[in-house]
Amino acid sequence: MTYLLALDQGTSSSRSIVFDERGHIVAQAQLELPQIYPQPGWVEHDPLEIWRTQIATARDALAKAGIAANAVRAVGITNQRETTVLWNRKTGQPVHHAIVWQDRRAEPACAQLREQGHAATIQAKTGLLIDAYFSGTKLQWLLDHVPGARDAAEAGELAFGTVDSWLIWQLTGGKRHVTDVSNASRTMLFNVHTNQWDDELLQLLRIPRALMPEVLPSASDFGATDAALLGGPIAIGGVAGDQQSALFGQACFTAGMAKNTYGTGCFMLMHTGSRFQKSENGLLTTSAAQAGQSPEYAMEGSVFVGGAVVQWLRDGLRAISASSEVQALAESVPDSGGVMMVPAFTGLGAPYWKPDARGTITGLTRGTTIAHIARAALESIAYQSAALLAAMSRDAVAAGGAPVSELRVDGGACVNDLLMQFQADLLGIPVVRPAVVETTALGAAYLAGLASGVYASTDELSALWQAERRFTPTLPRSQAEALMARWEHAVAQAVLPG
C-alpha cells in the first residue's frame, strides 16, 4: 500500500492526515494553535509554535497509522493563506511573531496605496483588491517596525514566507526557500500572468527581492524532509493554500467547476481554467493550484458569517445548547414563517461589500417561534452563498464562459442535510457532498501524489473522487427567485442610513 501524508496548518490548529492511494483517511492527529492578540485588530502566531505543533501531529499521525517514513511516498502541505513570517536565514529563527491573515495593522498602508491610485494596477497584475488581508503590506510593516529588519533584508540575511514556506524551510533543515503559485498569489506582490514576483510591486511596497522565496507549481519537487525529523527522508511534492487545495481536493480541475466550504464563514471558488477573469462583481481572481507550468485561475468570494450564525444561536440567543441541535429545531417547522435573518454581524462580504451593514431579523409576527428564527438563521447561510454563486456565474457568462452547473461542498456545516437541500433549491443546480469531506488536506495529498508518480494525471483523480450524496433542486424556479428577491430586500434593510 502506498501512503501520502498531508500537513494541514490552519488558523486555529495544526493537523496531519495519512491517506492511502485511494484518498481514504488512514489516521489523523491535531493540536490547537495558540492565538496572540497584542492589541485590538492585531492577530499573531508564534512561528515556532506553528512548527512545533505541525511536526508533532505529523509524527503522531504516522504512529497512529502504524507506518514508517519509508512507506510514505510524499508529503503535501496546505496552509492558512496570507499569514506572514520573516526569519533569519542563518539561525532559522523568526525575527517577529507571524502576522495572521485576519490582522488589520497594515490598513493605513493600504489606504495610502488606494489614495495614490494604485488599485487598478494591483488588480490587473495580481487579481486582488488592495487590502490589509494580503501579505505584502504585512511584510512592509515588519520591515518598517522590527529594528534592523530592513537593513538585514537588503543584505540578504532574512527570508520571507507564507506558512508553507516557513514549514518547508524547517522540514528541509533550511535547504529550501520555496512556495507555490497559489500561496504566492495571495501576497499582492505576485504577477499571476507571468507566475513571477513583480518587480514594480516589490518596489512600490519597498520589499527587497532578496527576501522572496522561489515560486514553483503546486505539484513540484519542494525538497525532502530532514531524515532526523520523521525517521527518514520523505519527498515534499505538493503545496497549496487552503482554499485552492480544497478546490483541488474536490477534483474541480476545469473551467466552470466550483466548490463552497461551509466553515465559520463560507469560501467559494470557481475554476476559470487558463482564463484570467477580472470580476465586475467584487470577487477576487486568484491562482488555482497548478499541477503544471501554465497559469490557471479561480474566482473567489467569501461570506463572513456562515456556520458562525449557529454558534450565535447557541451562545448569543441560547436557543440551542449544542450546534448539532440546530437541524432538528429548524426542521420542527415547515419553513421560516416569513422570517428573514441577515447575519451581518461584521458587515457583509462578497458580493455586497457593505462593511457598515449590521445584522437584522425581519418578518416577525406574534406567531414567530425560536424554531422559525433558527430556520431563518440556517437559511441565511444558503442565501448568502446563492448570492455569491450568482455573482460568479454573471462574471463567467460575461467572459464567454458558462454558469456553474453543480456546486461541490465541504466544511463542517455541509453535513446539515436541511441546509444542503435548501441550497440546491435556491441555486437551481445540484449540490454534491463528497465521500471524503476533508478536501483541503486531500488536495495537498493529491498534489503530492501527482508530483511523486502515485497518480498519472488529474483524470485519475477525477475518477477517484466520489459523491456521498447529491441534493437536487425540488423548488420551482419561480419560487426560488421570489425567495431570493425577499433576501435582497432584507439585505437592503440591513444597511443603515447615515
From Swiss-Prot:
GO terms for molecular function: ATP binding; glycerol kinase activity. It is an enzyme of class 2 (transferase). Keywords: ATP-binding, Glycerol metabolism, Kinase, Nucleotide-binding, Transferase. The keyword S-adenosyl-L-methionine does not apply. It comes from the Bacteria. Pathway: Polyol metabolism; glycerol degradation via glycerol kinase pathway; sn-glycerol 3-phosphate from glycerol: step 1/1. Sn-glycerol 3-phosphate binds at T11, R81, E82, Y133, D242. Glycerol binds at R81, E82, Y133, D242, Q243. Pfam families: FGGY_C, FGGY_N. GO terms for biological process: glycerol catabolic process; glycerol metabolic process; glycerol-3-phosphate metabolic process. CDD domains: FGGY_EcGK_like. InterPro entries: ATPase_NBD (IPR043129), Carb_kinase_FGGY (IPR000577), Carb_kinase_FGGY_CS (IPR018483), FGGY_C (IPR018485), FGGY_N (IPR018484), Glycerol_kin (IPR005999). GO terms for cellular component: cytosol. It catalyses: glycerol + ATP = sn-glycerol 3-phosphate + ADP + H(+). Belongs to the FGGY kinase family. Key enzyme in the regulation of glycerol uptake and metabolism. Catalyzes the phosphorylation of glycerol to yield sn-glycerol 3-phosphate. This is Glycerol kinase. The lineage of its organism: Bacteria, Pseudomonadati, Pseudomonadota, Betaproteobacteria, Burkholderiales.
